[in-house]
A protein has these predicted regions:
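Extended polybasic, low-complexity segments that bind anionic RNA or targeting/receptor surfaces
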Residues: 1-46, 92-213
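Glycine/serine-rich anion-binding loops at beta->alpha junctions
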Residues: 54-90
């Protein structure tokens, strides 16, 4: 897959880059994408939901009245779930929602997501951006030059860069990640992927070695 490399003004530089077909040209596997997204979203859940049972709520454990002879129903004590303030029956308990996935499954899911972006022509390769200081306005201007001002974008860089990351994180709808931390959910959630030139050159190696979903 061959793409033009654009400069920060949104113009073609006259250079192109070849993205590997074994990643961007595969037939996407929807099921592994589903599994990877489910794993990602499950890992975001805290899972600490909890209600008290009749054994845990505060209150007397004394039986309210004798079992028989009153003409009323048998009740037990005040912690009975039938009473206000009583324990809960079958309420939520702490639970982990994350699931385990093999590395090969996660890699296939990531490549499938990239293949979808390639089919949608939603990948832009941008020449490397060097910023001396964090400047949100500067990066927002770059997006406008690329006609991506109102789109959700995922910016992929080869390694962490303080100035670039701080510049893009305050732009609405823009998410930044280093190539080794890229995951299936972020790829699919973005309308367009912006690869810096250096990241694009490392892409085939890093995706094959990555472990995140």
């Amino acid at each position: 897959m061959q793409l033009d490399i654009l400069n920060t003004k949104g113009e073609k530089t006259g250079r192109t880059i070849e993205l590997p077909e074994e990643i961007f040209g595969i037939e996407p596997n929807d099921h592994v994408i589903y599994l990877a997204v489910k794993q990602y979203q499950g890992a975001q859940r805290q899972g600490t939901h909890k209600v008290k049972t009749r054994m845990e709520v505060k209150g007397s454990s004394k039986k309210l009245h004798k079992q028989k002879g009153t003409g009323g129903a048998r009740k037990g004590n005040l912690r009975n779930p039938l009473y206000k303030g009583g324990g809960s029956i079958f309420g939520p308990k702490p639970h982990k929602y994350d699931i385990k996935l093999n590395r090969k499954v996660k890699d296939l899911a990531k490549m499938s997501a990239l293949a979808y972006k390639a089919k949608e022509n939603a990948i832009v390769v941008l020449e490397d951006v060097n910023m001396d200081t964090p400047k949100t306005k500067t990066f927002s201007g770059i997006l406008n030059n690329l006609n991506l001002g109102r789109k959700k974008a995922l910016v992929v860089i080869p390694e962490y860069n303080d100035n670039l990351y701080l510049s893009l994180r305050n732009v609405q709808g823009v998410n930044g990640t280093v190539i080794s931390d890229m995951n299936t959910y972020d790829i699919l959630n973005a309308n367009v992927m912006i690869l810096t030139e250096s990241a694009a050159k490392l892409f085939s190696v890093e995706v094959a070695e990555g472990e995140d979903a």
